[in-house]
């Protein structure tokens, strides 16, 4: 079953300073992984796919 990425990413990004950017990247990662870690930051252990996606510079892609 697919999770509600909009809802999960709104929660994940609720405290982000770059809110629109956070939502964009969270959305991409959620679509790929069907998972968003709990809380607004960290907790990536529960979502290894999300934690391991990298951007073109080799940094973390997912907020």
UniProtKB/Swiss-Prot annotation:
* Pfam families referenced in this protein's UniProt entry, alphabetically: GASA
Query: Is NADP among this UniProt entry's keywords?
Result: no
Its domain of life reads Eukaryota
Against InterPro entries, the record matches this protein to: GASA
Which parts form a coiled-coil structure per UniProt? none
According to its UniProt record, in which tissues is this protein expressed?
Expressed in pollen (at protein level).
Keyword Ubl conjugation attached? no
Alphabetized, the UniProt keywords read:
Allergen
Output the PANTHER family linked to this UniProt entry. Answer: EXTENSIN, PROLINE-RICH PROTEIN
| Family listed | Belongs to the GASA family.
Q: What is this protein called?
A: Cypmaclein
